[in-house]
Amino acid sequence: MNVSRPSGRQADALRPVRIERAFTCHAEGSVLVSFGNTLVVCTASVEAKVPVFLRNKGEGWVTAEYGMLPRSTHTRSEREAARGKQAGRTLEIQRLIGRALRTCVDRTALGERTITLDCDVLQADGGTRTAAITGAYVALVDAVRCLEQRGQLKKSPLIGAVAAVSVGIYRGMPVLDLDYPEDSDCDTDMNVVMNDEGGVIELQGTAEQQAFRRGELDMLLALAERGTAMLFDIQREALAR
Protein backbone atom coordinates (compact mmCIF):
# COMPACT_ATOMS: atom_id res chain seq x y z
CA MET A 1 0.00 0.00 0.00
CA ASN A 2 1.46 3.32 -1.10
CA VAL A 3 0.46 5.74 1.65
CA SER A 4 2.48 8.83 2.50
CA ARG A 5 2.99 9.89 6.09
CA PRO A 6 2.51 13.63 6.79
CA SER A 7 6.15 13.85 7.90
CA GLY A 8 7.44 11.99 4.85
CA ARG A 9 8.98 9.29 7.05
CA GLN A 10 9.08 5.62 6.14
CA ALA A 11 6.54 3.43 7.95
CA ASP A 12 9.22 1.96 10.22
CA ALA A 13 11.11 5.19 10.96
CA LEU A 14 11.29 7.00 14.28
CA ARG A 15 11.24 10.75 14.47
CA PRO A 16 14.64 12.25 15.33
CA VAL A 17 15.21 11.31 18.98
CA ARG A 18 17.63 13.20 21.24
CA ILE A 19 18.39 12.77 24.93
CA GLU A 20 20.28 15.55 26.73
CA ARG A 21 21.48 14.58 30.20
CA ALA A 22 22.12 16.86 33.19
CA PHE A 23 19.50 19.26 31.86
CA THR A 24 18.86 20.78 35.30
CA CYS A 25 21.35 21.33 38.12
CA HIS A 26 19.45 20.25 41.25
CA ALA A 27 17.96 16.81 40.59
CA GLU A 28 20.02 13.62 40.95
CA GLY A 29 19.07 12.79 37.37
CA SER A 30 17.58 14.97 34.66
CA VAL A 31 17.15 14.85 30.90
CA LEU A 32 15.49 16.72 28.08
CA VAL A 33 14.13 14.14 25.67
CA SER A 34 12.79 15.00 22.23
CA PHE A 35 10.87 12.84 19.81
CA GLY A 36 10.65 15.18 16.85
CA ASN A 37 8.71 18.21 18.10
CA THR A 38 7.63 16.52 21.33
CA LEU A 39 9.80 17.79 24.19
CA VAL A 40 9.71 16.41 27.73
CA VAL A 41 11.84 17.25 30.76
CA CYS A 42 12.33 14.22 33.02
CA THR A 43 13.90 14.60 36.47
CA ALA A 44 14.70 11.89 39.01
CA SER A 45 14.67 12.96 42.65
CA VAL A 46 15.85 10.76 45.53
CA GLU A 47 14.29 10.98 48.99
CA ALA A 48 15.27 8.98 52.08
CA LYS A 49 11.72 7.82 52.77
CA VAL A 50 9.14 5.40 51.41
CA PRO A 51 5.33 5.33 51.31
CA VAL A 52 3.57 4.20 54.48
CA PHE A 53 2.82 0.74 53.09
CA LEU A 54 6.57 0.07 52.65
CA ARG A 55 7.89 1.35 55.98
CA ASN A 56 10.29 -1.00 57.76
CA LYS A 57 10.16 -3.55 54.94
CA GLY A 58 13.63 -2.90 53.56
CA GLU A 59 12.34 -1.95 50.12
CA GLY A 60 12.41 1.22 48.07
CA TRP A 61 9.87 2.73 45.71
CA VAL A 62 9.85 4.26 42.25
CA THR A 63 6.98 6.51 41.29
CA ALA A 64 6.19 9.19 38.72
CA GLU A 65 4.30 12.41 38.16
CA TYR A 66 3.34 13.79 34.76
CA GLY A 67 2.14 17.15 33.59
CA MET A 68 1.84 19.38 30.55
CA LEU A 69 2.68 23.07 30.43
CA PRO A 70 -0.33 25.22 29.56
CA ARG A 71 0.93 26.07 26.07
CA SER A 72 2.54 22.75 25.26
CA THR A 73 -0.37 22.20 22.86
CA HIS A 74 -1.84 24.21 19.98
CA THR A 75 -4.17 26.11 22.31
CA ARG A 76 -3.59 26.98 25.95
CA SER A 77 -4.88 24.58 28.59
CA GLU A 78 -5.63 25.67 32.13
CA ARG A 79 -3.12 24.46 34.71
CA GLU A 80 -4.41 21.49 36.66
CA ALA A 81 -3.32 23.23 39.86
CA ALA A 82 -5.67 26.08 39.00
CA ARG A 83 -8.53 23.60 38.53
CA GLY A 84 -7.75 22.00 41.86
CA LYS A 85 -7.46 18.41 40.61
CA GLN A 86 -5.59 16.27 38.12
CA ALA A 87 -7.33 15.05 35.00
CA GLY A 88 -7.97 11.35 34.51
CA ARG A 89 -5.54 11.29 31.59
CA THR A 90 -2.79 12.73 33.76
CA LEU A 91 -3.32 10.13 36.48
CA GLU A 92 -3.38 7.33 33.92
CA ILE A 93 -0.11 8.42 32.31
CA GLN A 94 1.82 8.98 35.52
CA ARG A 95 0.76 5.57 36.82
CA LEU A 96 1.91 4.04 33.55
CA ILE A 97 5.32 5.71 33.85
CA GLY A 98 5.73 4.55 37.44
CA ARG A 99 4.71 0.96 36.63
CA ALA A 100 7.07 0.85 33.67
CA LEU A 101 10.10 2.11 35.58
CA ARG A 102 9.52 -0.14 38.59
CA THR A 103 10.04 -3.18 36.36
CA CYS A 104 13.72 -2.34 35.91
CA VAL A 105 14.52 -1.78 39.60
CA ASP A 106 15.36 -4.28 42.35
CA ARG A 107 13.56 -2.44 45.13
CA THR A 108 15.34 -4.36 47.88
CA ALA A 109 18.71 -3.27 46.50
CA LEU A 110 17.40 0.31 46.32
CA GLY A 111 16.84 0.32 50.08
CA GLU A 112 14.29 2.41 51.93
CA ARG A 113 14.31 5.42 49.64
CA THR A 114 12.00 6.75 46.94
CA ILE A 115 12.95 7.88 43.44
CA THR A 116 10.33 10.13 41.90
CA LEU A 117 10.34 10.70 38.15
CA ASP A 118 8.78 14.05 37.26
CA CYS A 119 7.90 14.24 33.58
CA ASP A 120 6.87 17.67 32.32
CA VAL A 121 5.82 18.17 28.72
CA LEU A 122 7.21 21.38 27.25
CA GLN A 123 5.82 20.78 23.78
CA ALA A 124 3.40 18.10 22.60
CA ASP A 125 3.32 16.67 19.08
CA GLY A 126 2.17 13.13 19.84
CA GLY A 127 3.77 10.40 21.92
CA THR A 128 4.30 12.34 25.13
CA ARG A 129 3.91 9.30 27.39
CA THR A 130 6.30 7.16 25.37
CA ALA A 131 8.86 9.97 25.26
CA ALA A 132 8.45 10.43 29.02
CA ILE A 133 9.11 6.75 29.75
CA THR A 134 12.13 6.62 27.44
CA GLY A 135 13.64 9.78 28.92
CA ALA A 136 12.73 8.97 32.52
CA TYR A 137 14.71 5.74 32.32
CA VAL A 138 17.89 7.70 31.54
CA ALA A 139 17.17 10.12 34.40
CA LEU A 140 16.65 7.11 36.68
CA VAL A 141 20.02 5.65 35.70
CA ASP A 142 21.73 8.95 36.47
CA ALA A 143 20.02 9.11 39.87
CA VAL A 144 21.25 5.59 40.69
CA ARG A 145 24.77 6.53 39.57
CA CYS A 146 24.59 9.54 41.87
CA LEU A 147 23.69 7.29 44.82
CA GLU A 148 26.57 4.97 43.93
CA GLN A 149 29.01 7.88 43.81
CA ARG A 150 27.83 8.92 47.28
CA GLY A 151 28.49 5.40 48.56
CA GLN A 152 24.83 4.92 49.48
CA LEU A 153 24.25 1.69 47.55
CA LYS A 154 25.89 -1.70 48.06
CA LYS A 155 25.00 -2.68 44.50
CA SER A 156 23.10 -1.17 41.61
CA PRO A 157 19.35 -1.82 41.82
CA LEU A 158 18.98 -1.56 38.05
CA ILE A 159 18.03 -4.86 36.43
CA GLY A 160 17.39 -3.82 32.84
CA ALA A 161 16.38 -0.99 30.56
CA VAL A 162 12.92 0.29 29.62
CA ALA A 163 11.75 2.24 26.57
CA ALA A 164 8.39 2.95 24.96
CA VAL A 165 7.10 3.84 21.53
CA SER A 166 3.79 4.39 19.81
CA VAL A 167 2.59 2.43 16.81
CA GLY A 168 -0.63 2.64 14.86
CA ILE A 169 -2.53 2.06 11.67
CA TYR A 170 -2.65 5.25 9.62
CA ARG A 171 -4.81 5.14 6.51
CA GLY A 172 -4.53 1.37 6.45
CA MET A 173 -0.74 1.27 6.94
CA PRO A 174 1.02 0.14 10.16
CA VAL A 175 3.41 2.92 11.21
CA LEU A 176 5.94 3.59 13.96
CA ASP A 177 6.11 6.58 16.32
CA LEU A 178 3.01 8.59 15.45
CA ASP A 179 3.17 12.37 15.53
CA TYR A 180 0.09 14.50 16.21
CA PRO A 181 -1.31 14.65 12.64
CA GLU A 182 -1.15 10.83 12.46
CA ASP A 183 -2.36 10.28 16.00
CA SER A 184 -5.43 12.45 15.42
CA ASP A 185 -6.35 10.67 12.17
CA CYS A 186 -5.36 7.04 12.73
CA ASP A 187 -7.47 3.90 12.59
CA THR A 188 -5.60 2.31 15.52
CA ASP A 189 -3.37 3.83 18.19
CA MET A 190 -1.13 1.75 20.45
CA ASN A 191 1.56 2.47 23.03
CA VAL A 192 4.07 -0.29 23.72
CA VAL A 193 6.48 -0.42 26.67
CA MET A 194 9.29 -2.98 26.45
CA ASN A 195 12.47 -4.00 28.22
CA ASP A 196 15.84 -4.56 26.60
CA GLU A 197 15.37 -8.34 26.65
CA GLY A 198 12.41 -8.10 24.28
CA GLY A 199 9.81 -8.46 27.01
CA VAL A 200 6.56 -6.53 26.81
CA ILE A 201 5.79 -4.49 29.92
CA GLU A 202 2.57 -2.83 28.83
CA LEU A 203 0.31 -2.54 25.79
CA GLN A 204 -2.29 0.20 25.41
CA GLY A 205 -4.15 -0.26 22.14
CA THR A 206 -7.36 1.24 20.84
CA ALA A 207 -9.25 0.98 17.58
CA GLU A 208 -10.16 4.59 16.85
CA GLN A 209 -12.26 4.15 13.70
CA GLN A 210 -12.38 0.47 12.82
CA ALA A 211 -11.36 -2.77 14.49
CA PHE A 212 -7.91 -4.18 13.81
CA ARG A 213 -7.16 -7.83 13.12
CA ARG A 214 -4.69 -10.22 14.71
CA GLY A 215 -2.34 -10.00 11.73
CA GLU A 216 -2.28 -6.21 12.03
CA LEU A 217 -1.59 -6.50 15.76
CA ASP A 218 1.39 -8.73 15.00
CA MET A 219 2.70 -6.16 12.51
CA LEU A 220 2.32 -3.38 15.08
CA LEU A 221 4.20 -5.37 17.71
CA ALA A 222 6.99 -6.07 15.23
CA LEU A 223 7.24 -2.34 14.54
CA ALA A 224 7.32 -1.64 18.29
CA GLU A 225 10.14 -4.15 18.75
CA ARG A 226 12.11 -2.43 16.02
CA GLY A 227 11.41 1.00 17.47
CA THR A 228 12.33 0.15 21.05
CA ALA A 229 15.52 -1.57 19.86
CA MET A 230 16.55 1.72 18.26
CA LEU A 231 15.57 3.60 21.42
CA PHE A 232 17.70 1.32 23.60
CA ASP A 233 20.67 2.16 21.37
CA ILE A 234 19.93 5.88 21.77
CA GLN A 235 19.66 5.50 25.55
CA ARG A 236 22.96 3.62 25.73
CA GLU A 237 24.68 6.25 23.59
CA ALA A 238 23.33 9.03 25.82
CA LEU A 239 24.46 7.26 28.99
CA ALA A 240 27.94 6.69 27.56
CA ARG A 241 28.53 10.40 27.01
From Swiss-Prot:
Coiled-coil ranges from the UniProt annotation: none
Tell me what reaction this enzyme catalyses: tRNA(n+1) + phosphate = tRNA(n) + a ribonucleoside 5'-diphosphate
Q: What is an example of a GO molecular function annotated in this UniProt entry?
A: tRNA binding
Q: Please name the SUPFAM superfamilies in this protein's record.
A: Ribonuclease PH domain 2-like (SSF55666), Ribosomal protein S5 domain 2-like (SSF54211)
Q: Which residues bind phosphate?
A: 89, 127-129
- Kindly list the biological process annotations in GO that this record carries: rRNA catabolic process; rRNA processing; tRNA processing
Q: Which UniProt keywords apply?
A: Nucleotidyltransferase, RNA-binding, rRNA processing, Transferase, tRNA processing, tRNA-binding
* RNA-binding recorded as keyword: yes
E.C. number(s) listed in UniProt: 2.7.7.56
Which InterPro entries would you find in this protein's record? ExoRNase_PH_dom1, ExoRNase_PH_dom2, ExoRNase_PH_dom2_sf, PNPase/RNase_PH_dom_sf, Ribosomal_Su5_D2-typ_SF, RNase_PH, RNase_PH_bac-type, RNase_PH_CS
Superkingdom is Bacteria
Q: Which Gene3D superfamilies match?
A: GHMP Kinase, N-terminal domain (3.30.230.70)
The record's listing under CDD domains reads: RNase_PH_bact
The UniProt entry, under PANTHER family, shows: EXOSOME COMPLEX COMPONENT, EXOSOME COMPLEX COMPONENT RRP41
- Oligomeric and partner information: Homohexameric ring arranged as a trimer of dimers.
Do you know which NCBIfam families this protein is assigned to?
RNasePH
Q: What does this protein do?
A: Phosphorolytic 3'-5' exoribonuclease that plays an important role in tRNA 3'-end maturation. Removes nucleotide residues following the 3'-CCA terminus of tRNAs; can also add nucleotides to the ends of RNA molecules by using nucleoside diphosphates as substrates, but this may not be physiologically important. Probably plays a role in initiation of 16S rRNA degradation (leading to ribosome degradation) during starvation.
Task: Give the family per the record.
Answer: Belongs to the RNase PH family.
Q: Which protein, by its recorded name, is this?
A: Ribonuclease PH
- The scientific name of the source species is Xylella fastidiosa (strain 9a5c)
